[in-house]
């Protein structure tokens, strides 16, 4: 069973869906977080597969990934320009709480 940090449900959902008006970004984040937890490593997935998994268009998946990278909620690496990206889910709220705590 996938376990989510309380922040993901209590704050991040409201922030991405309500404030940013980017519900697809939230769905993509959830999918990547769950897959990263299952695999215990960054997730390698194409835009097409990501879009199909979430149930949106490929362009919506691309926009969601770009927004999540902009918000520093995921990071992306590639072996080369045409390679399938590897996405690592980030939890910046944990780093912030450690600095202030």
Protein language model features and the residues they cover:
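Short recognition helix of helix-turn-helix/winged-helix DNA-binding domains
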Residues: 1-53, 82
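Key DNA-contact positions within bacterial/archaeal DNA-binding proteins
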Residues: 59
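Winged-helix/helix-turn-helix nucleic-acid-interaction surface
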Residues: 62-101
